[in-house]
Amino acid sequence: MRLDQAIAARFPDLSRRKARELIAAGRVLVNQRPVRVASRFVADSDQLTVAGDLPAIEVLASGDDWVAVNKPAGMPVQPTRDRATLSLEEMLRVEHREIFLVHRLDTPTSGVVLFARTREAAAQFSELFAGGAIRKTYLAVIGGTIERETTIDAPIDGKEALTIVRPLRDSLVEVEIKTGRTHQIRVHLASIGHPVAGDRRYGGPSAPRLMLHAWKLQHESIGEIEAPIPPELSDRWPGGASPPPVAPGFPRAE
């Protein structure tokens, strides 16, 4: 069946004419990749996604072979079984035919996510992340307060996991992770009795959202990339002061 016919058949609210318009605009994805040819044949087993009017994704910085964007809280990084929500990866593929995810954030976490533009760059960045060469700094609101910098060195699922927590103000903390285990920050903070606010899974105090934000990525290949701090976290800075720098020596990415 032609793609425009398949879209009209699977999405009763869309006419075939509207389907062709969406296809031409690059807002129809076949198996997670945009297709702009209405006459393309698709099989019943092909996964079709209609992007419609896409929300704007803020590009924080970019290079020849990479792009960094600001992920909103609640948006999955990758396609999920629940097709009701379009993923960040799918939306970027509308604009960038070739895009490769090199690390992940949990769906409820906001902040900077790095994508590669080529397979070669993806392999290189994946290796850098796996080896801990790219510095990853988060902001979190936790249950209770901590008085001094705390290092949590505790395996997760049998694998090494290292987290450094620095108090900023009241329950706001800066978190640096040296490894990248699943839910690492959430697991480690809960393990010391200070779960992330809004984290139902690990017993965090009530909050409008998971109060965890991927603030900065730093490496000589990308410079320093910073995601704007959401109001629910930035409101906690005293007297409108600017957040403290994470580390010197990295030029800010433009």
Model regions: which residues?
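RNA pseudouridine synthases
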Residues: M1-E160, M211, P231-E254
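Pseudouridine synthase
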Residues: A19, A84-L92, T118-A121, D170-G223, ...
